[in-house]
Amino acid sequence: MNAAKHKKHADLARPSLGNFGRNEWAVLGTPCPAIKKLSEDIIAALSISYKCAYVDAAHVKEGQPAVLPGRLAAGAFAEYADKINHHEFVFNKKFNAFGFREVLQDADLILVNGNHQQAKSQVVVIDKVKEASLKRKLNQLTDVQLFLLTEGETTIFDFLKEAIPKWEKIPVFSLQEKDKIVDFFRNKMECAIPKINGLVLAGGKSLRFGSDKGMINWHGKVQREYVAELLQPFCKEVFISCREEQQAELNGNFQSVTDTFTDLGPYGAILSAFRKQPDAAWLVVACDLPLLDTNVLKFLVEHRNHSSIATTFQSPHDGLPEPLITIWEPKSYQMLLSFLSQGYSCPRKVLINSDATILQPPFPDALMNVNTQEEFQKAKALLGLETK
């Protein structure tokens, strides 16, 4: 056996997820009705901006048999009902973190009844009624971010001070200070908005056009580098998406993402970017948009809806979402993979069949792409360049 440690699995970048999603807090240390009420107050205040979810468990009296609802009692493993103003799924199967994260993939903020379930971060309520119960859950306090004092409580329990590093730096509010609690979560969510990376799609073979569209000089430099420079003011990092054989052509000014999902066109390029950095949002732009400018990108970023799976423009040509000038949020990664597993590799189909935010383009001509020599000549004329 080799001295080097054998690796059984690919070294994949994993998204920063908890048991249920990216941003989750377990509230524990007080009776369940108080946790439910607090969660309702937070959700009522923040649901206008964020998709919120609540996770709990039912209480069953000892010795009382579990009764399955509806058709589950007849042996069904699942039942779905369209409730007109909402949808209801009921399952008779075991769930673990993988299943929870799939069901709640759209959620931005998840509040968990920590008396029954665990979450990545915690809010600890100081309540004499649940002191003994809280002592038994010390191993669950892995990332305490807030203390809440119930009426009559004035200090943190001593056993918490011993168990939680730097406990004195954790904010402390009264459970009745609802505005402060809501502001705490609002600030946490604002800080959790994913950074934007830029991705220039330059890996196509340009079969219809006849030559590499990324190498056309529209603005004094090759188009793929021009677009990459346009993206820089709006992105933390900018990458050029390319095929393996194109790597040697890049001059080193920009990072690259080589397709690891091959033979899927732009769909594979987007997935390859998420595979590299799954917690980033990706501003994906095709390199065949010669009229694209800073104003269009600025409009897209300023109107970004980070709670959607993506923010895009409506195409002025066919009225459909334009997938190749789109901000794809991290939550879209799982959806893109899901569509692929069902036999679809069209990013536009994902946008059509999801909650994507679709904007009217401020300058419709900027979305004109060049796939043929006729479109090439039209673009040159619009740019005031010499035409043949």
Enumerate the predicted regions with their spans:
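N-terminal phosphate/diphosphate-binding loop that engages ATP/GTP or pyrophosphate donors
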Residues: 14-24, 36-93, 98, 103
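Short, charged/polar "capping" segments at the starts of alpha-helices
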Residues: 34, 60-66, 131-134, 152-160, ...
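Short acidic-hydrophobic, aromatic-tinged amphipathic segments that line or gate anion-handling sites
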Residues: 4-8, 78-82, 149-150, 166-178, ...
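Phosphate/Mg2+-binding loops and adjacent switch elements
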Residues: 109-187
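Nucleotide and nucleotide-moiety/phosphate-recognizing core
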Residues: 33-35, 45, 58, 193-344, ...
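Extreme N-terminal, non-catalytic leader segments
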Residues: 1-26, 173-191
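Short, high-confidence coil segments that cap the C-terminus of an alpha-helix
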Residues: 22, 49-50, 76, 104-109, ...
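Charged phosphate-binding loop/patch that engages nucleotide di/tri-phosphates or the phosphate backbone
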Residues: 162-195, 368-388
